[in-house]
Amino acid sequence: MVVAVKGPYTSKPRPALVVQADLFNPTHASVTICPITSDCVDAPLFRVTLPPGDRTGLTTASQVMVDKIVSVPRPAVVREVGRCDPAYLDLIDEALCRWLDL
């Protein structure tokens, strides 16, 4: 799920991808996310590019920053803005496994 998250360094909510297991989403005090940036770089091993559109809720091509995985307090997640297609989730899963050496 693509969400808008309020961070400590900006007043404007930023997009992020929830990577935490659905089992823990309703009950845990924090949510594990990978931030999403529109500042795309050539790093296919740990940055997955998502397309803009109604499905993702993104206005421009953006990258999931697997290398910046973090847990944030549940109240920091402002709202859901979109969803990620299964093919992209598979790429993100592979990148997470690679980054975390799982």
Label every PLM stretch briefly.
Residues 1-102:
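Conserved functional hotspots at enzyme active or ligand-binding sites that engage polyanionic ligands
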